[in-house]
């Protein structure tokens, strides 16, 4: 009952007018307390008066005011009692509806606040003679006798928690701010302006606006407050209201998903992602469909180390509606074209379907089929027109291979590259570097090459003959490709080099290590040359390149060419069709296109590119032939039918159809001989022919008349 009476008196007292400073006894001398938007008295006039609940009352008179402020001096309370607490030299009740309730939610009944209201904190150890609640923004603070610590708030702090009294003096006296005032941001227990979030630490913090819980400067790596663990620099996404990491710390990789960003270990870049190392901009865990380093529409990928170019990965699975290309470097739209390897076609799925674009690394042939190499259909090359890959004919006359622009790169035997054209060699040459008889680089079978002074080309003529004197041969003991070469020189100080005798001193590059040369032969050849039948030969020049592929060191052949054997510098020519042999009559391995029969090799059937077991059992078909999966023995011409597969007349290169049903996949149709390659129509050609006949006839008639008339004259 007394409590209710006391509360009623207090509330009646508070119903007085707002704090004003006056000089009369019982009036407020100093309005020094601000609670919320209101001001209250902190010092009164008159010896018997002191502030209770922010107003001046007579605290000498017995009653509730004296209970709340039992001790006073000089217009201020020096001790509080009951359910009050001291704040800025006044005693305040913590009851609801009173100004003190905004400072303290409960007190201990002996004049000390035990639970501070939001925006304030209760210093540990405060007595009823000391201020026992401090504003979070009070930077002056209060010194508590017990322990001697001065407890302070933080400038512009709106909410906080009390310092840890057990911590050191310096660490334990400042409150921990949990929310700053309006327009301020909490950073490292300091309330700062928004622009100061990144002061001195570029992009290490971000300003996060939060009107409910308070604005904060959040460290990029503070995952407990919305940051990203192991993040080095970041930004704030206003749309998602999330911190977005822009660079992870060393040895971590930035991964971005629909849920946000994270920093992960390298081995976690999987399941639709792959790692990219970048010491400058930061390592990244990129999605397989990354527009720069990934593959469009790729869902599952694998990192390719050391690859140069745009894509750093190969794709093993694509998103719906797409499939990996043959080389796994792109994702291609899934089509319903029945032509194998076809990406786009007209009359899709019908009998008259025509493929217009191939997928992956395959090329569109002249017959609208898809093939992995244009060289398989003859003198064609792979070209790119826009986004399409096409097989185009190498139109340069006598050209063996063209580049992807159609420019001739190598000429057929008997021709040499002359600018963009192929010009004929001299009739005595098999291959040449120019058009004269002394420009031969290889000779026809049975003819020997004699190099000129520069050692790069020479003349083709009859094989080795014996004689005496300088440059003559004593023994013609080497035969290569039907032509004989010298194996022992007539002059003992000379030796055969590439089959020709000359002294060591006359060589532009000495190829024999013997010093001096003795007996007209070389005992040890230099590196990059190999010894053969008394002479030294090169693997890059004829005739040496015919018999040896590699001779890097030691002056001996390390790898003989197919069809030859070199044993201690002595050449053995294997039998026909033999790739490797123990002797000239004992073959151990046959060349492609031959099959082993006892110790010899038998040529495969004409329909076979390779055969196995018997000459007519094709392992791979020759150009112009095909073989069905169920077919045995020889291959079938592209023009003929076999085991349910239909051939196509005039087809020069083909493959069996899928599932071995229907027509062959024809890659090239032969020229019938009536093709008009000039581009003129048949009518135009006929008109020109008639005109030529008329002109020629008229000219002959005129000449006859002229001579007859002159004869009469």
UniProtKB/Swiss-Prot annotation:
Mapped to this chain, the residue ranges on the Cytoplasmic side of the membrane are 709-713
- GO cellular component terms, A-Z: plasma membrane
Q: Which membrane topology term applies here?
A: Single-pass type I membrane protein
Which SUPFAM superfamilies does this UniProt record tie to the protein? Answer: Growth factor receptor domain (SSF57184)
Instruction: Indicate the secretion signal residues.
Output: 1-17
Q: Which Pfam families match?
A: VSP (PF03302)
Protein localization: Cell membrane
Task: Tell me the residue ranges located in the Extracellular compartment per UniProt.
Answer: 18-679
* The entry's keywords: Cell membrane, Glycoprotein, Membrane, Repeat, Signal, Transmembrane, Transmembrane helix
Q: Which residues get glycosylated?
A: 289, 676
Q: Among its keywords, does the record have Transmembrane? A: yes
Keyword GTP-binding assigned to the entry: answer is: no
Q: Where are the transmembrane segments?
A: 680-708
Give the comment on domains.
Answer: Contains 29 repeats of the CXXC motif.
PANTHER family attached to this UniProt entry: CABRIOLET.-RELATED, EGF-LIKE DOMAIN-CONTAINING PROTEIN
> Which protein family is named in the record?
Belongs to the Giardia variant surface protein family.
Q: What is the protein name stated in its UniProt record?
A: Major surface-labeled trophozoite antigen 417
């Amino acid at each position: 009952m007394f409590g209710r009476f006391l509360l009623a008196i207090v509330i009646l007292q508070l119903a007085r007018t707002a704090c004003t400073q006056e000089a009369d006894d019982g009036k407020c001398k100093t309005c020094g307390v601000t609670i919320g938007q209101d001001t209250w008295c902190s010092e009164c006039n008159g010896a018997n008066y002191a502030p209770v609940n922010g107003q001046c009352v007579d605290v000498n008179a017995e009653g509730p005011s004296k209970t709340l402020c039992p001790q006073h001096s000089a217009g201020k309370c020096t001790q509080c009692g009951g359910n009050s607490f001291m704040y800025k030299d006044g005693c305040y009740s913590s009851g609801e509806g009173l100004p003190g309730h905004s400072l303290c939610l409960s007190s201990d009944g002996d004049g000390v606040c035990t639970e501070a209201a939001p925006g304030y904190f209760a210093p540990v150890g405060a007595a009823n003679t000391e201020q026992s609640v401090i504003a979070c923004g009070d930077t002056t603070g209060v010194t508590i006798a017990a322990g001697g610590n001065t407890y302070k708030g933080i400038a512009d702090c709106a909410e906080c928690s009390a310092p840890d009294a057990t911590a050191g003096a310096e660490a334990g006296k400042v409150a921990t701010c949990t929310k700053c005032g309006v327009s301020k941001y909490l950073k490292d227990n300091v309330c700062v302006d928004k622009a100061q979030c990144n002061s001195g630490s570029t992009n290490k913090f971000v300003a996060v606006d939060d009107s409910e819980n308070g604005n904060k400067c959040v460290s990029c790596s503070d995952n407990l407050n919305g940051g990203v663990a192991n993040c080095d620099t970041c930004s704030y996404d206003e749309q998602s209201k999330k911190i977005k990491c822009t660079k992870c710390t060393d040895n971590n990789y930035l991964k971005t998903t629909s849920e946000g960003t994270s920093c992960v270990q390298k081995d976690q870049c999987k399941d639709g992602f792959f790692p990219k190392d970048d010491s400058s901009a930061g390592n990244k865990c990129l999605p397989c469909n990354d527009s720069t380093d990934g593959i469009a529409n790729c869902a599952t990928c694998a990192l390719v180390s050391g690859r140069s170019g745009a894509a750093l990965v190969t794709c093993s699975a694509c998103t719906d509606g797409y499939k990996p290309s043959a080389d796994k470097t792109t994702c291609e739209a899934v089509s319903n074209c029945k032509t194998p390897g076809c990406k786009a076609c007209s009359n899709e799925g019908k009998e008259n379907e025509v493929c217009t674009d191939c997928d992956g690394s395959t090329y569109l042939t002249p017959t609208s089929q898809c093939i992995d190499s244009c060289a398989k259909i003859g003198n064609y090359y792979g070209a790119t027109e826009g986004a399409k890959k096409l097989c185009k004919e190498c139109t340069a006359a006598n050209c063996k291979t063209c580049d992807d622009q159609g420019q001739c790169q190598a000429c057929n035997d008997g021709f040499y590259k002359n600018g963009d054209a192929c010009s004929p060699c001299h009739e005595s040459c098999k291959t040449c570097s120019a058009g004269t008889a002394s420009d031969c680089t290889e000779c026809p079978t049975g003819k020997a090459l004699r190099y000129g002074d520069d050692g790069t080309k020479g003349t083709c003529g009859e094989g080795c003959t014996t004689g005496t004197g300088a440059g003559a041969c004593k023994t013609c003991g080497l035969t290569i490709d039907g032509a004989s070469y010298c194996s022992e020189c007539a002059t003992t100080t000379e030796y055969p080099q590439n089959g020709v005798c000359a002294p060591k001193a006359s060589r532009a590059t000495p190829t024999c290590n013997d010093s001096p040369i003795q007996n007209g032969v070389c005992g040890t050849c230099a590196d990059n040359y190999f010894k053969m039948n008394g002479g030294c030969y090169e693997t890059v020049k004829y005739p040496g390149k015919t018999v040896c592929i590699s001779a890097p060191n030691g002056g001996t052949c390390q790898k003989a060419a197919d069809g030859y054997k070199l044993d201690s510098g002595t050449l053995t020519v294997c039998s026909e069709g033999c790739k490797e042999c123990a002797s000239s009559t004992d073959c151990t391995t046959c060349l492609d296109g031959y099959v082993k029969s006892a110790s010899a090799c038998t040529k495969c059937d004409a329909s076979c590119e390779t055969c196995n077991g018997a000459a007519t059992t094709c392992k791979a078909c020759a150009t112009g032939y095909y073989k069905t999966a169920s077919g045995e023995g020889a291959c079938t011409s592209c023009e003929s039918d076999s085991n349910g597969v239909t051939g196509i007349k005039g087809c020069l290169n083909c493959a069996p159809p899928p599932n071995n049903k229907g027509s062959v996949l024809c890659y090239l149709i032969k020229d019938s001989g009536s093709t008009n390659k000039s581009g003129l129509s048949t009518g135009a050609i006929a008109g020109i022919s008639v005109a030529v006949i008329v002109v020629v006839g008229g000219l002959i008639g005129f000449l006859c008349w002229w001579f007859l008339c002159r004869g009469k004259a």
